[in-house]
UniProtKB/Swiss-Prot annotation:
Highest rank taxon of the organism: Eukaryota
Protein name: Hemocyanin A-type, units Ode to Odg
Record organism: Enteroctopus dofleini
SS bond list: 51-62, 176-243, 334-340, 468-478, 589-656, 743-748, 886-896, 998-1065, 1152-1158
Cofactor: how and how many bound: Binds 2 copper ions per heterodimer.
Region ODG: start-end pairs: 840-1233
Region (ODD): 1-4
Cross-link 2'-(S-cysteinyl)-histidine (Cys-His): residue positions: 63-65, 479-481, 897-899
Positions of the UniProt region annotated as ODE: 5-422
Amino acid sequence: EGNEYLVRKNVERLSLSEMNSLIHAFRRMQKDKSSDGFEAIASFHALPPLCPSPTAKHRHACCLHGMATFPHWHRLYVVQFEQALHRHGATVGVPYWDWTRPISKIPDFIASEKYSDPFTKIEVYNPFNHGHISFISEDTTTKREVSEYLFEHPVLGKQTWLFDNIALALEQTDYCDFEIQLEIVHNAIHSWIGGKEEHSLNHLHYAAYDPIFYLHHSNVDRLWVIWQELQKLRGLNAYESHCALELMKVPLKPFSFGAPYNLNDLTTKLSKPEDMFRYKDNFHYEYDILDINSMSINQIESSYIRHQKDHDRVFAGFLLSGFGSSAYATFEICIEGGECHEGSHFAVLGGSTEMPWAFDRLYKIEITDVLSDMHLAFDSAFTIKTKIVAQNGTELPASILPEATVIRIPPSKQDADIDIPLNHIRRNVESLDERDIQNLMAALTRVKKDESDHGFQTIASYHGSTLCPSPEEPKYACCLHGMPVFPHWHRVYLLHFEDSMRRHGSSVATPYWDWTQPGTKLPRLLADSDYYDAWTDNVTENPFLRGYITSEDTYTVRDVKPELFEIGGGEGSTLYQQVLLMLEQEDYCDFEVQFEVVHNSIHYLVGGHQKYAMSSLVYSSFDPIFYVHHSMVDRLWAIWQALQEHRHLPFDKAYCALEQLSFPMKPFVWESNPNLHTRAASTPQHLFDYNKLGYKYDDLEFHGMNIDQLENAIHKTQNKDRVFASFLLFGIKTSADVHLKLCKDETCEDAGVVFVLGGDNEMPWPFDRTYKMDITNVLHKMHIPLEDLYVHGSTIHLEVKIESVDGKVLDSSSLPVPSMIYVPAKEFTKEIEKEAVRGTIIRKNVNSLTPSDIKELRDAMAKVQADTSDNGYQKIASYHGIPLSCHYENGTAYACCQHGMVTFPNWHRLLTKQMEDALVAKGSHVGIPYWDWTTTFANLPVLVTEEKDNSFHHAHIDVANTDTTRSPRAQLFDDPEKGDKSFFYRQIALALEQTDFCDFEIQFEIGHNAIHSWVGGSSPYGMSTLHYTSYDPLFYLHHSNTDRIWSVWQALQKYRGLPYNTANCEINKLVKPLKPFNLDTNPNAVTKAHSTGATSFDYHKLGYDYDNLNFHGMTIPELEEHLKEIQHEDRVFAGFLLRTIGQSADVNFDVCTKDGECTFGGTFCILGGEHEMFWAFDRPFKYDITTSLKHLRLDAHDDFDIKVTIKGIDGHVLSNKYLSPPTVFLAPAKTTH
């Protein structure tokens, strides 16, 4: 296979003959003046310009920067260069210069001025040292000004800037997030090699004329390949993008021009970005090795990226766009008082002929360590001061970049739960229906027939066969027993089996057998002798009944002990009590010992004294019951984890045996493991969160008790004095049952059995703490008072008999003599949870107001409108727009209301509260009612439409000397879709679905805008104008509902276990004062005290509450389930990057096929005005266009257009320059991990 591809090798690992072929091929290529020569191909990048077409009057550079197709264009470009080089005699692909590792110098291959041919001994100039730019002059060559940044050698334990930032790029799981991080890091090499030299790598116009460009971009492309391999390891798509879909079918120029400009038929034919993903198949090259800093793909993910994600991190975010020049940006972190510390830096590559570009998401650079050194928290008050210097040394105005934002990414364990599809939910084996049983049996039959490494024999051999420490020198079995990582090894092992079952057609996750429940026989799945296979129309042996052991040419057997059904059997039974004692433990390693030994009991009770059975460490995994047993075992660990979380104790980490948790487990980590999923999950410390492994359990109840009830049951057992037999266990090279007797004098009673699972090839193990068996009931049965245990010379003692699995009685001294431990009763005081103090004012649905409520509100509003003080209507309404009361540093006045920014919800929460408190001061006993416009309505609320004696009908605008008016549009009432298909419902449901506050805010705000536009219509003094909207009393009912929607989202976040009273994005903006609420002129002490975004999340502290937080009749848990159901379908979104346009407008768009057939795509509104505060979102507003595409019979990846029309509220059509072209991205159905 290797002969079919050109191999790109590390430039430092080229052989003499390979270097020789590259040098001479490139010399020939530089002399070639045709379209296949070096300078012709170098011109593809920028100058002389060829785009948009060679004959266009105004041309620009063809290279794509600052957009999602940057990697695609440059992948094709390196192929263009590589194949030309190959045609000129090169025997290998374009070598790559790996700058991700610490370097001391630029490789000689590209730095030396001369090259001495090792075969002819003739010295010639090194063509890779520089390039000629003949279109300027014959004497013009590229220059280099190498920066010391390139030769960074970090202190021990730290990595270089380049490595850290590439690792951050590789961490991303969304292609467009990866792309922006990759591109900006790549820019640094351009900057650090070219410096201030004009004809250099640091100038977009001339970069491609320096031969180092191609070695640099070979490495950039290799990093993309590494990311693709990581995506495959993660189980995510590596060969297509789900974002920027509109760009993926646009041919890349000038490659698509063909002859005479491009003489390469392959790059002409395969010139669409979508062709670039499968580089080996389409372009026939590969890399010698895919590593970073000597870390393999698996190690990058498991040992580095996951480790980084386990930490709380803070980033500065920059929304970048082109400004016609290369530049270097540095920034400082500054606190009040002027003290500043160096933050970090990044580069932009540009030139005057560059194609216009703007990213639609933030470039992130980590500042965690800087803040830590400054003793600052992520939400401390600090500013980021950015300095931008152009390539020629000119300092550019800081305003060329939007203000940097601060983002916090909490440790990954705090991420949202992964939505697990039904076929990844492990259920009780007794709850399976006939179809489930048939499916599992058919899948296991196929797994058993599979003789590959995905088949049963290989999987079963992982447990007990002699494979470790390496297949080359096998000494013992790989399974981990008798050590703290026993649960982790078996968690990933069961996952490995389950993945194979799914690969062979199983649509049912591995069920669990709850052996603590009463029973008289094994479950049907495990015990039926045969089953009917509907596919083959045959009656076949039940594959779960036994397993074949190829190496022994025999089948597994079972010797089920009657005690299995005697010691199980519900509350009071031995297994129940043993599991309860296990779950009682609060230290992970204490839990693990109890857990493992209880699990051993089932191996013994099913396998008995048989060799090829569950009771043998070597052969237990060949009996399929093993996997159903271990599904229950893993579930018990999950229950303990839930208990620990309930106790506010560590549940996703251990503070013991730390040395074992960081080492990848064998054989899963080996390259011979064909399952990339389990290979990536082979490190114990990453296995605590089973949701991230792609499965969960139907429930975590134990004998009908939820976690809270289970904890109470544990407390009941702890409320009594107890005595335990304590065993210090270690490996004895065999499976054995240890029979315990409690004796007084010569009288003895059976006290229980401890089973040890082992074998002659077991990995050596000793527990470092004891296994405890409760013998309190035996003492009571023998009428031995607990006090007698303390009597000197007492004859109370323990005796053991040890019987190996083959029936031999072992010397009782094979294990240390157990001791007795007395544990006194614990007392528990039940904590009484205090409910959050409810606000004194309740906001009701406007349609549920009583006549007395309505009268009270109208009377109070009339009094507020008559009040000319700072707490009167005119003053409060002016907070939003005109008269202008906020000022820039230069004195220019602007409207204080915050729109198009993260604090929009917070600012309007305070304004609504300000008006509400004014109403309360004038006699209202109810809060501002909310108008729920997400439900179907045919008219505006009666509260605001009755004309007679109604202060809510309109209000006077003193500053304009006129009254407010409304001009509702037809679409406000005439939505043809109802219920969960209606316009407002769909917009708000999409907002509520978001789990990041900034994602929610954008969807939420733009959804709210439509009410402003459609109620106010063309009225200049109404809801549709930012300047005067707050003078219409309806504004406050609208914003009461808007605030309630935010409150619903907050309740959803709380239910999801995610931040709800804080945000992890744009943190620096959330700590800034919200004017004018913070000013001394504000008479409201409550809004003044909460006049930042950060302090206004908790609305209970503002003294109000809602009558309920239901959404369309759904409670918060029901709403969350409904939102998840919505996500179970593929959806396609148009993304609009919105910013200030200085007026209110409606945006309508159609989706059109390339043949011109169009259908309505959607509509949304922008609320603005001449005096609005400047704003720009840092991420796209998403609009679902799935239905529109279905109407046109289009798929997300098809070629289509989105035609946008922007209309001002006065009906005039506005220029499309106000909006960037929309992007398209796919949100795949959440049905697979």
